[in-house]
Amino acid sequence: MIKHTCLQNVVTSPSNIKHHFIFFRIMKVAIVTGGNKGVGFGICRGLAKVFDGDVLLTARNEERGMNAVKELEKEGLTVKFHLLDINDPKSVGALAAFIKERYGGIDVLVNNAAIAFKQAATEPFALQAKVTIATNYFSVQDCCNQLFPLLRSGARVVNVSSMAGFLGLIKGADLKSKFASSGSTLTYEVLDGLMKDFVDSANAGDHAAKGWPNSTYVVSKVGLSAMTRIQQQKVSEDSSLKDVAINHVHPGYVDTDMSSHKGPLTPEEGAKSSLFAATLPQGTNIKGKYIWHNCELVDWVNGPKPDV
């Protein structure tokens, strides 16, 4: 629903006072990080078809971002581009400032940008841990910290997790118990500490002995999913915001660069769960949930994990 606001601008002059009425439309906006290719591009395409407002495709490379916009234009779809490197707080701040001035708030935020090292990667595991956790967890957290103050009531936030983000992949009982408390007693500070402990343990070479998996991507996405549950808890406690839904989704095994094009799903099919979460109706009870690629809700803590 589009809202209209009337502002009265009073101009005072020595001789008289004139009343000017300015009508403007409050534009809705949906932001997709990492939107120039893969699942992110599929999400932008899907939102451009159904979202009543501007769709902002963001990417860290302007040329690739603009090429993605032009590709959608050839399909008769309109999206806008904004430069964004989620690893650069100043870049995130520039986006936040633009959104605040241009739109006044955020209606949909899809945190899709992420990285994954290939199985054949030659970088040391400790380096992979440092880079992956920094990007997939802490940089997404920074985006949320800077953009969440702009969320409007009724906003939808989608954190693109993964089947790798399923809690059952954490085998250490103590670690699993701590992650499972997200959404109830786990704090951001303790969760941050868990992420840092993994990086430190990977550097020391004793991460497996502590119950961590041998996958930096798994840890990053489990952390993102746990963060999602805390975010929903905090937003639900905020009386200034109504009906904000924050969910984490598994896009499926998708034919993208990240999967080395081994996935059976198309980017459009991979976008399905994100589009479902981004367009949940008013008053939805789907909040803080783990949504599978077929849009079914999965018990993130107890499972069982469905088929890929």
PLM segments and residue spans:
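C-terminal helical subdomain
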Residues: 142, 244, 248-249, 254-256, ...
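Catalytic loop of short-chain dehydrogenase/reductase
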Residues: 122-125, 129-130, 153-241, 250, ...
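Conserved internal alpha-helix within the Rossmann fold of NAD(P)-dependent oxidoreductases
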Residues: 139-144, 166, 224, 274
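The beta1-alpha1 cofactor-binding region of Rossmann-like NAD(H)/NADP(H)-dependent oxidoreductases
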Residues: 62-63, 83-94, 126, 137-140
